Amino acid sequence: MISFQVNGKPVNFDGDPEMRLLWALRDNLQLTGTKYGCGIGRCGSCTVHIDGKARRACITSVSSLEGKSVTTIEGLAGADLQLHPVQQAWLEEDVPQCGYCQPGLIMATVDFLQSHPKPSDADINANIDNLCRCGTY
């Protein structure tokens, strides 16, 4: 059994330890905000936070999560259900288009802003490498 936390709640996973985190989240825990895009860790649609750092869930095996903390887009809002400031900015700036890639983009942005609180356009372009499935971004 592999024990870890997802969005602050304990998880005791007794399935295939080599299952990718993406499928454990979506199929076992019914957390469908994390999206499947490429399956090879390139597009970023599946970005979650593991111990506070952005990681691609489609290439992360559950076996690597023992004792770790996973945050998904569903867990990004505060306990009071107040949107995270990045989520709020996404809405205020009217960013949403089709929305498929946005959970991953939001998660990547939150991680990026922790180390780059006042980024330049060049910083953003160099560090946010998520791909947009519909081509809007």
Question: Where are these predicted regions, by residue range?
Answer:
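Signature of N-terminal electron-transfer/Fe-S-associated modules in redox systems
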Residues: 1-137
